[in-house]
Amino acid sequence: MSLFKGKTLMITGGTGSFGNAVLNRFLKTDIGEIRIFSRDEKKQDDMRHDFQARMPEVADKIKFYIGDVRDLQSVRGAMPGVDYIFHAAALKQVPSCEFFPMEAVRTNVIGTENVLTAAIEEGVESVICLSTDKAAYPINAMGITKAIEEKVAVAKSRMSGKTKICCTRYGNVMCSRGSVIPLWIDQIKQGNPITLTEPSMTRFIMSLEEAVDLVLFAFENGENGDLLIQKAPACTIQTQAEAVCELFGGKKEDIKVIGIRHGEKM
């Protein structure tokens, strides 16, 4: 972690699963400060209390900033003194983005442009933008906006001065907030059949730790304008569901197929 010694890292959308994973890994290192930039004060308060309870000796390294990536002025307000940025703020639920596509544009596209504009103005050293495999040959609003986010990052990298801008592209991050595995676990605990959309649907999968590793790899090895994609194992949703049943005592015969959601890929 010597590259982070005494440095200030800002994580946009930092109260999510990725932000928590970064804090768990970084707080006990020699990093100077981690800024959590997000719009939900309740999630910030929950995170503050959680880390004060679990890591009281280093919790004061976390600084919380209320703001929204859609608002350039609020992004600028959190930027002074920042050395590095992990840009994780996004709308990522496929059906939500499908029903409200302009909301996805405002967060995933305009929000990214705002973060990069403010970072370049402030002379931030490095920005890593988190994207998704759904940006490849996109068929839904979420994938389309994340593909444009990548284009925005590449375009900004051509005029970024000393600021290095890279993107990483993820598969499905297991057990992240809003993903299907926590839903299945809750359904099993409640004694209900687990629901899946389409058994033959295939997804690339990775753990939260692998997600953090990919961002760190991009941070350490990426060149300005790069898009880094990790090779990841793939499996069907049926296989995932059966594995969760085995681990948590669910019944495979109770798996209930509910059909593909709006905008989903096979």
Question: Where are the language model's segments positioned?
Answer:
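N-terminal Rossmann NAD(P)H-binding glycine-rich loop of SDR-like oxidoreductase domains
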Residues: 7-29
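Conserved Rossmann-fold NAD(P)-dependent oxidoreductase catalytic core, especially the SDR/UDP-sugar
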Residues: 84-87, 91-151, 155, 165
